[in-house]
């Protein structure tokens, strides 16, 4: 009799995706982040669901309802901080996952990569809207500043902003719709993640060498299931250390002050995971130019397959490209630091130089390095 795992219509899908899936024998811990992102997503949906049971999306009670969750709801504080810091872990895993894709040339799986970029944008939109919900000072002013960027669009900008706000300023209508979108988008992300997996399983995983591994495959279970469990334990350890010892480490103290449209905080800044993009936005003095640079900083990922000039897929055997990759990583950390600093000398100049370097590395230096490495290898 055939194994039920291989014959049952539902079990068969799970089996082909997580049990009997042929996987390369040499994939490193950098391949753990996909499963960690799945765990983060499930954690965020569950904690978010319990938060939504007690949260009210009205401007007069939103801030109080979050305080009520932390003070009066059984274990509400841990649910709230798991959700807030879970978002930080989500983005750490996301950026590591994207970095892995860039380093090992995984972007040559076009459909998987493109769905991945759409996923990144959707997660960023969801996180932004979630940050508005507690209705603190930084929630309100962050929402005002970021939505206002759309007014830079010629002709329709102002109407578009007022349409998104549902009025002439960020108010009740804005908060209610942001809550609605923040609730629905994680399920859209889940669907997109399944499509992402679907396309990945059409081709199979890449590996650190970038060389096809069809000749040497091993079953996903038990080899990579146990490896993913180890990754999940490390993720949960870091998350719990954050939540239980310094839950507000990555947050902004201004968000413990209720939103006040009449009082602007001295430094408006988003959560830490958006600071690099915020720094790029601020580095251009023109509003429309800044908005375009902001969009380009993420959408540039879609160009990666077109900018690949090397005859090798991975950077494993390409020292010049490796140096440029780590320079890019350092540049992103610099931009993250600058995004959290006030707009004054020398931060403005550092931000502008870091922004120029960011686009130069991706658009110019990396493709040139690929050509040089081909020549060095007499290809």
From Swiss-Prot:
This protein's UniProt keywords = Electron transport, Heme, Iron, Membrane, Metal-binding, Mitochondrion, Mitochondrion inner membrane, Respiratory chain, Transmembrane, Transmembrane helix, Transport, Ubiquinone
Q: Name one GO cellular component term.
A: mitochondrial inner membrane
- The record lists its disulfide bonds as none
Q: Has keyword Iron-sulfur?
A: no
Q: Which residues bind a ubiquinone?
A: 201
Q: Which residues bind heme b b562?
A: 83, 182
Report how it sits in the membrane: Multi-pass membrane protein
Quick one: where is this thing mainly located?
A: mitochondrion
Cofactor(s) listed in the protein's UniProt record: heme b
- As given in the record, the signal peptide range reads none
Q: Name one Pfam family in it.
A: Cytochrome_B
Give the record's cofactor note, including how many are bound: Binds 2 heme b groups non-covalently.
Bilayer-spanning residue ranges: 33-53, 77-98, 113-133, 178-198, 226-246, 288-308, 320-340, 347-367
Q: Where in the cell is it found?
A: Mitochondrion inner membrane
A molecular function GO annotation: metal ion binding
Q: Where does heme b b566 bind?
A: 97, 196
Q: Name one GO biological process term.
A: mitochondrial electron transport, ubiquinol to cytochrome c
Q: What does this protein do?
A: Component of the ubiquinol-cytochrome c reductase complex (complex III or cytochrome b-c1 complex) that is part of the mitochondrial respiratory chain. The b-c1 complex mediates electron transfer from ubiquinol to cytochrome c. Contributes to the generation of a proton gradient across the mitochondrial membrane that is then used for ATP synthesis.
- Family indicated by similarity: Belongs to the cytochrome b family.
Describe its partners and assembly state: The cytochrome bc1 complex contains 11 subunits: 3 respiratory subunits (MT-CYB, CYC1 and UQCRFS1), 2 core proteins (UQCRC1 and UQCRC2) and 6 low-molecular weight proteins (UQCRH/QCR6, UQCRB/QCR7, UQCRQ/QCR8, UQCR10/QCR9, UQCR11/QCR10 and a cleavage product of UQCRFS1). This cytochrome bc1 complex then forms a dimer.
Q: What else is known?
A: Heme 1 (or BL or b562) is low-potential and absorbs at about 562 nm, and heme 2 (or BH or b566) is high-potential and absorbs at about 566 nm.
What name goes with this protein?
Cytochrome b
Gene it is expressed from:
MT-CYB
